[in-house]
Amino acid sequence: MNHFQAILAQVQTLLSSQKPRQVRALLDGLLEEELLSREYHCALLHEPDGDALARKISLTLLEKGDLDLTFLSWVCNSLQAPTVERGTSYRDHGDHSLCATMDLGSPEGSYLELLNSDADPLHLYHLYDQMDLAGEEEIELSSEPDTDTINCDQFSKLLQDMELDEETREAYANIAELDQYVFQDTQLEGLSKDLFIEHIGAEEGFGENIEIPVEAGQKPQKRRFPEEHAMDSKHRKLVPTSRTSLNYLDLPTGHIQIFTTLPQGLWQISGAGTGLSSVLIYHGEMPQVNQVLPSSSLSIPSLPESPDRPGSTSPFTPSAADLPSMPEPALTSRVNETEDTSPSPCQEGPESSIKLPKWPEAVERFQHSLQDKYKALPQSPRGPLVAVELVRARLERGSNKSQERELATPDWTERQLAHGGLAEVLQVVSDCRRPGETQVVAVLGKAGQGKSHWARTVSHTWACGQLLQYDFVFYVPCHCLDRPGDTYHLRDLLCPPSLQPLAMDDEVLDYIVRQPDRVLLILDAFEELEAQDGLLHGPCGSLSPEPCSLRGLLAGIFQRKLLRGCTLLLTARPRGRLAQSLSKADAIFEVPSFSTKQAKTYMRHYFENSGTAGNQDKALGLLEGQPLLCSYSHSPVVCRAVCQLSKALLEQGTEAQLPCTLTGLYVSLLGPAAQNSPPGALVELAKLAWELGRRHQSTLQETRFSSVEVKTWAVTQGLMQQTLETTEAQLAFSSFLLQCFLGAVWLAQCNEIKDKELPQYLALTPRKKRPYDNWLEGVPRFLAGLVFQPRAHCLGALVEPAVAAVADRKQKVLTRYLKRLKLGTLRAGRLLELLHCAHETQQPGIWEHVAHQLPGHLSFLGTRLTPPDVYVLGRALETASQDFSLDLRQTGVEPSGLGNLVGLSCVTSFRASLSDTMALWESLQQQGEAQLLQAAEEKFTIEPFKAKSPKDVEDLDRLVQTQRLRNPSEDAAKDLPAIRDLKKLEFALGPILGPQAFPTLAKILPAFSSLQHLDLDSLSENKIGDKGVSKLSATFPQLKALETLNLSQNNITDVGACKLAEALPALAKSLLRLSLYNNCICDKGAKSLAQVLPDMVSLRVMDVQFNKFTAAGAQQLASSLQKCPQVETLAMWTPTIPFGVQEHLQQLDARISLR
């Protein structure tokens, strides 16, 4: 049967109903079903002709392969979708009026705008019908529909035959699942729904009469899983309903007559006094104008909005975002506008409200248990809390040839702070998510920065009723996923057996799988998983009952195949190949270190909480007396260790002094505990720390200890602590840095490691075969300190003297290794680590040897410089007694650290980002540091400068404006050295940003009086065009030192070439090289260049290859070349010149190059 006319009638009826939201809903539904492209969807929204819009929609529906499915889907999702309006008296939890919601608006001049107007639709319809349509072309696409009737037996047989087709079953299952919401909100649609589903799923025909007794006062039962999203269409199956499915309806006692044949058109079923609206059964062609759908007398209440909209309510009611087939416009209303829902005159009866069904009891019970579990967890870590703001991070291409992505290091002033806690950040990020797509959010930071506290705070926040965009939050510490083999199911990932178990039965798991967009999965300490490599490209698991590996489950989530649409939150240390797994992350954040002010605040709170507030100032004085520990206190875990030792020293009442190294700090903390330990307890704990670190773990079973006494001692002394919420008897080291220290203790005193293998654990020159991955990244510094520092006050204070004597042999091995190192071959990060190791040794010979080998130019471009790095680098530069130039761009160095390095007398010049440097100047000027400000200005250089982004041009403009403000008289002697001494400037912004940013650069070019090389190509087509050349030419009189001008690939035509030729004589005495390679210069431009060529007395090389001038232009250039004996090369090969002409010109003058 040809359905075009029937579909067209339905669409025309819908478009004439004056409900623009239904029109938009229909178009959005077609877009979601991929029946429309986004471009065609946008065009239909702007279609001004209603009849044309109806024809285009009908043609789109007709082009679908299965016409019946198209028609049924359209009826379910568009025609019978209830319009939801919010009452004007509705208020949210904050007692804010929500009567005004988002005004989606309509495209100007479109049919949607016409529907929103106040014009009478019937008047417009007749007016349009009377218009002259003679000029329009009418195309008959289909014949009249077949008017034959079909009875129920034939229809059932047809459905049974189609069930043999897999695609047909899946498509009908799609319809059956997606239209649940459409039919469940009103009794009208509830009846139609059950009739439809019962008829599809019945294995036998209905009897002629069915008697359904209903008890008086019985409430209608609601279907389960009201919010349930349909799974992927490839996995949907049509589940036949039982013959008793009509029991879901509250029908009057009596008989229901089943007709085996239905009349053509609309058939109305109504029951007086039942409170039910009329039921319409459609068959055949829908009348277009003379038949009108009866309106419902039911009052449809507002649906609670989803959590990402204002006014969200209980999570047990479906939100607007959860309705699978309800487009967004159908759930919003215009400002100060309500839709008329008054009953028609032919309908009577009281209004009835519909109560939305809740979740299944098992799902609701599981959610409450999960919330109670998170509420019971302790939220505050040991010690005080100091609020820090997350910093947005990004990945960039590495500097090596592997093309791997790594975490970028922004300049200090370029940092983007994410205000608010992680819960607020998740709220903002979720607002930007694409529907149905998995969202990956990563929170990175060094050990001890508080990442796990951030993660636990999110789960606790959700348990307390916030983060309403999620129905379930699963907080999973990754150490609980350490089970070998292919024995993992999805429920094992969400609720690991080693955690406090929660009963997740199949019903709960099925609900979670069908509602992944309401799930937040938190994987804490992701670096502890061995299965983190290759997650984006490796094989992934499935939702089948068969178990798979943990890597397979994680790969399925990262590849957006399992729980597609969920939110995945990772916390990890930024190391190893983690960046490869995060290359497609939606958002990456970093937990920053303490600032100096925050570190002091932490110390004050620590002493206040411990009841010794009077020792605050004394403790701060002790810390300020040790600059290295002061710089390390930017790490919260080290700051806590400093507070603990300071408190112990002040309680002793003796002359207190903190140690000068990080190794000394931990030796002082663990020394008293080691003296009161069982025999060999510290060595045993050190061995466990090392073995766990080699396996990337930080937790262990209590049975790993040799005795209960050793375990009790470790827990009592605060070295180990119970893990949260685990069912097994597990312990974890109190901090990652403590585990590193204990691992270094094991290396320093054991005999199991050969001497020749010891240097690899300094991680300075990794081996090519079986390299040491340095997961315990604090081991190298502690190992150097334990081996080299005096035995009595270091290693001897922790272990027995006989055991400590082993360190003497290891000291000789490491001394020989350190003195053979060639510092010039080390990368910036390993050079800093070497400086730290040399400082921890406290051996003057090793420290001076390393310092004197430092090269004169030190580049830390792209390497993160922490406060401890700045301190040891400054000490090394002072010890070296030579001049240095530093490149500190993209290091993230703090302004105070930058000032400390710049103020060193041995630093003669430095490079840093323009924004960071100018921020330092402003800070020094405000502080009155005139001498340091002068040094910072004189040592700063930007030679050579390459502009790769608009921000680079803006910063350069700010630098020039700063100079003009300080030197309004334009005295060259008072110019900033960075501007006065700039000799090479490259401009590489590309063809899009180049034309936009070049006018700013041209405006400030005259300030660079010493500029010798101006490269406007730099392997990037900037395409500044003729306008750019015109602006550039105006600056030539001030660029008296310019020797090289590269204007290649800039889309210059004859107009620009003529402008350039007019201005070139201003550079006659300085310009040596001119390149106009690959532009659009024709004969006229070539002629103008030929005319000015004899005036360029200093020009040596000119390149005009790959332009568009012909033999005439080439001959003019060759003739002019005869008058220029100073020119050495004229490159002018171009495909528009005949090869014979070029050869002839080259024979006349050998200086003409055709290569």
Curated annotation (Swiss-Prot):
For the ligand (GTP), the binding residues are G445, K446, A447, G448, Q449, G450, K451, S452
What are its E.C. numbers?
2.3.1.-, 2.7.11.1
Care to name a GO molecular-function term for this sequence?
A: protein serine kinase activity
Its EC top class is transferase
Q: What segments bear the compositional bias annotation Basic and acidic residues?
A: 224-233
What is this protein's expression induced by? By IFNG and LPS. By STAT1 in the upper small intestine.
Instruction: Name the domain of life.
Output: Eukaryota
Q: Which GO terms describe its cellular component?
A: cell surface; cytosol; PML body
| Record-annotated membrane-spanning stretches | none
Q: Which InterPro entries match?
A: Leu-rich_rpt, LRR_dom_sf, MHC_II_transact, NACHT_NTPase, P-loop_NTPase
Please provide an example of a Pfam family that matches this protein in its UniProt record: NACHT
**The LRR repeat ranges on this chain:** 1010-1033, 1041-1062, 1070-1091, 1098-1119
Q: Name where it's found.
A: Nucleus; Nucleus, PML body
The record's keywords, sorted A to Z, are: Activator, Acyltransferase, ATP-binding, GTP-binding, Kinase, Leucine-rich repeat, Nucleotide-binding, Nucleus, Phosphoprotein, Repeat, Transcription, Transcription regulation, Transferase
How is the protein modified post-translationally, according to the record?
Autophosphorylated, affecting interaction with TAF7.
Q: Where is this region: Disordered?
A: 217-237, 297-357
Q: Which residues form the NACHT domain?
A: 439-749
Question: Where this protein primarily resides, as one coarse class?
Answer: nucleus
The catalysed reaction is:
L-seryl-[protein] + ATP = O-phospho-L-seryl-[protein] + ADP + H(+); L-threonyl-[protein] + ATP = O-phospho-L-threonyl-[protein] + ADP + H(+)
The entry's free-text remark on domains says: The acetyltransferase domain is necessary for activation of both class I and class II transcription.
Protein name as it appears in the record: MHC class II transactivator
Tell me what organism the protein belongs to.
Mus musculus (Mouse)
Q: Tell me the name of the encoding gene.
A: Ciita
